């Protein structure tokens, strides 16, 4: 698949006037032609449609309004775009030669997940990725199990920066969020009373607090939602549901601490269940429907490759050349090394 993608992009980049013939240049040319026209006649329907097409090929909110983000992309020269394509062609060379017959592909700057089987796209959904200071890593691994009604073992960094300060302000904060405290990170660690932690906080600096484990059980407040999809890796990154559905309405979706939030986790689960006959789908639905159910892990009979990539320029499934914001500044870093 990556070989075909490389071939497609090479054919595109060698085509004469690739950028000047594209929709972004059409929009720019129309704007320049109309500069001397009275203001009320400048922005006609044709130009609005050209702007909308331009916004779609750049991952922007397609409203036809030439806002700051749209202006930023319009102001990119043909030379800059060709260099961006070259950077991504080089990046494609680093990808696995064979992604497998069935795999999950996540392109970070596109904020999108696709599940592909025999070159057909089975699923296509919006995702939320890591913010700039907590970037989602680029790597490949294999999904081996799914966790229903997951507990959230809150990372130590989040505990110290967010949870403990809130606990100091409100002693009932943990109870209101369904968060329990344990003596350590072992699964058999003893539970600790909130008062004990508060006493420790009062006597010590937050950074000196012992390594308690803060765990949030299954609930509507749990940031992992009702399910997570695990492909064990050194980055501790996984795919998961989220209660913050409104974020998927945004064009720019870099908000997480590194994990990938799914807009349609139920569809991914359903697709996996349809093809993995070793899993009792009725039991799965029962677990998800009952609020009293505890965390439950379900193994997959066949592991599914997961590839997390970073392409700011690519050809989509419709053969359209796409550009995206360099959200982690990786293009700038690579450009210094290449040019």
Regions found by a protein language model. Name each.
Residues 1-61, 68-339:
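Well-ordered beta-sheet/strand-loop patches within structured domains
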């Amino acid at each position: 698949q990556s070989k075909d993608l490389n071939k497609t992009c090479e054919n595109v980049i060698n085509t004469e006037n690739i950028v000047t013939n594209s929709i972004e240049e059409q929009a720019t040319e129309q704007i320049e032609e109309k500069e001397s026209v009275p203001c009320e006649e400048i922005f006609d329907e044709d130009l609005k449609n050209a702007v909308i097409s331009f916004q779609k090929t750049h991952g922007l909110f397609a409203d036809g309004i030439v806002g700051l983000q749209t202006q930023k992309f319009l102001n990119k020269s043909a030379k800059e775009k060709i260099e961006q394509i070259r950077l991504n062609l080089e990046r494609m060379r680093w990808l696995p030669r064979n992604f497998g017959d069935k795999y999950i592909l996540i392109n970070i700057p596109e904020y999108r997940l696709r599940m592909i089987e025999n070159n057909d796209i089975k699923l296509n959904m919006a995702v939320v990725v890591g913010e700039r200071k907590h970037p989602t890593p680029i790597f490949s691994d294999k999904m081996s199990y799914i966790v229903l009604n997951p507990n959230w073992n809150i990372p130590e960094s989040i505990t110290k920066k967010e949870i403990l300060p809130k606990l100091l302000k409100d002693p009932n904060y943990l109870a209101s969020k369904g968060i329990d405290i344990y003596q350590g990170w072992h699964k058999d660690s003893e539970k600790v009373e909130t008062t004990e932690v508060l006493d420790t906080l009062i006597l010590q600096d937050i950074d000196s607090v012992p390594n308690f484990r803060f765990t949030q059980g299954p609930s509507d407040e749990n940031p992992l939602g009702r399910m997570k999809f695990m492909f064990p890796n050194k980055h501790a990154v996984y795919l998961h549901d989220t209660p913050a559905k409104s974020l998927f309405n945004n064009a720019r979706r870099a908000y997480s601490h590194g994990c990938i939030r799914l807009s349609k986790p139920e569809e991914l689960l359903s697709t996996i269940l349809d093809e993995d006959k070793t899993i009792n789908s009725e039991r799965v639905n029962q677990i998800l429907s009952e609020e009293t159910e505890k965390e439950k892990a379900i193994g997959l009979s066949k592991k599914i490759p997961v590839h997390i990539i970073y392409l700011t320029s690519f050809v989509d499934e419709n053969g359209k050349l796409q550009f995206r914001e360099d959200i982690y500044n990786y293009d700038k870093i690579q450009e210094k090394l290449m040019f």
